[in-house]
């Protein structure tokens, strides 16, 4: 029973270190869709993003996460009838479309636990002012949990706690919801993930059910333009779950010429995050380094995160195409 308790702690700890059961990325500012399904298609582009995160490099069994995401706006092209100054009618091109689609898959290994998951989202976009868009999104999700039993040694190879479900892997369906407000100057978003709090079977008898916690994210950013070619963007992200005390990221990013950016943020779970990146034609590359202020820093080389993304669509369409409704 003692051995059973220890391994259950390892398993559940891998699922929910400090209550965080979902992968956490430091570059969410550049792919808000990962934390809010309402973001899908909000800027009118079609984009794809690949991220890799190595946490606590040098520490055995540390989390390692990979994700691939994509999103798009379903656009319709047509013509709008307008009256010109001479009293005649003219047809002018317009771009329409209120529906966004998105999805992502991820793989996350944390100690003995291997997790894979997916999300498929649908979003709807409305105008509340001439340049302010309100988006709402709903997503279906699924998570697959599996113990890597090759890394576990038992005195009894038929250890009863490792039930057939864990040997094959456990699939947990769920859903996410998000609201997102976008303006050329600011963005605000609220989302909830794992809405249903589904239960995963993690063992036999009294240890069969482990509930997935509902997670909440509140995000906001604002853009100042001290010059015509530069922006300063303060941002904040508040994260909460039913088992995790609130955690916040507070950051500041400098953008030059819409081509280069560099930022610094502080995470209240005792970490400092530096990030920078650049764009080239329709591609952007970003890198983040997390320096933890906790004791584990003595045995690690920090956390590294790399993101590569590609975006399709007319560059002049951002914000401008939105005026064509």
Language-model regions: role of each:
Residues 4-13:
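Sec-dependent N-terminal signal peptides
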Residues 13-14, 189:
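Small side chains
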Residues 15-19:
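Sec/Tat signal peptide C-region and signal peptidase I cleavage site
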Residues 20-325:
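Subset of outer-membrane beta-barrel
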């Amino acid at each position: 029973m003692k051995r059973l308790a220890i391994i259950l702690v390892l398993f559940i700890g891998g699922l929910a270190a400090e209550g965080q059961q979902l992968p956490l990325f430091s570059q969410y500012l550049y792919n808000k869709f990962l934390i809010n399904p309402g973001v899908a298609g909000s800027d009118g582009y079609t984009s794809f993003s690949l991220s890799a995160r190595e946490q606590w490099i040098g520490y055995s069994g540390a989390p390692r996460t990979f994700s691939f995401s994509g999103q798009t706006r379903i656009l319709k092209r047509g013509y709008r009838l307008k009256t010109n100054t001479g009293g005649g009618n003219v047809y002018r091109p317009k771009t329409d479309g209120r529906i966004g689609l998105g999805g992502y898959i991820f793989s996350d290994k944390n100690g003995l636990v291997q997790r894979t998951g997916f999300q498929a989202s649908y979003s709807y976009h409305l105008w509340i002012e001439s340049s302010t868009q309100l988006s709402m999104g709903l997503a279906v999700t699924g998570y697959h949990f599996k113990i890597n039993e090759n890394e576990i040694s038992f005195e009894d190879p038929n250890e009863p706690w490792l039930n057939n479900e864990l040997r094959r892997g456990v699939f947990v369906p769920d859903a996410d919801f998000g609201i997102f407000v976008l303006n050329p100057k600011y963005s605000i978003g609220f989302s909830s993930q794992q809405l249903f709090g589904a239960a995963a079977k993690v063992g036999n008898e009294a240890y069969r059910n482990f509930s997935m916690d509902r997670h909440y994210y509140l995000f906001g950013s604002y853009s100042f333009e001290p010059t015509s070619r530069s922006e300063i963007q303060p941002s904040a992200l508040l994260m909460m779950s039913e088992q995790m005390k609130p955690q916040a990221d507070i950051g500041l990013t400098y953008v030059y010429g819409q081509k280069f950016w560099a930022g610094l943020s502080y995470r209240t779970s005792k970490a400092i995050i530096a990030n920078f990146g650049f764009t080239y034609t329709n591609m952007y590359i970003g890198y983040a380094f997390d320096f933890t202020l906790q004791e584990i820093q003595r045995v690690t080389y920090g956390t590294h995160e790399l993101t590569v993304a590609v975006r399709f669509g007319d560059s002049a369409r951002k914000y401008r195409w939105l005026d064509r409704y």
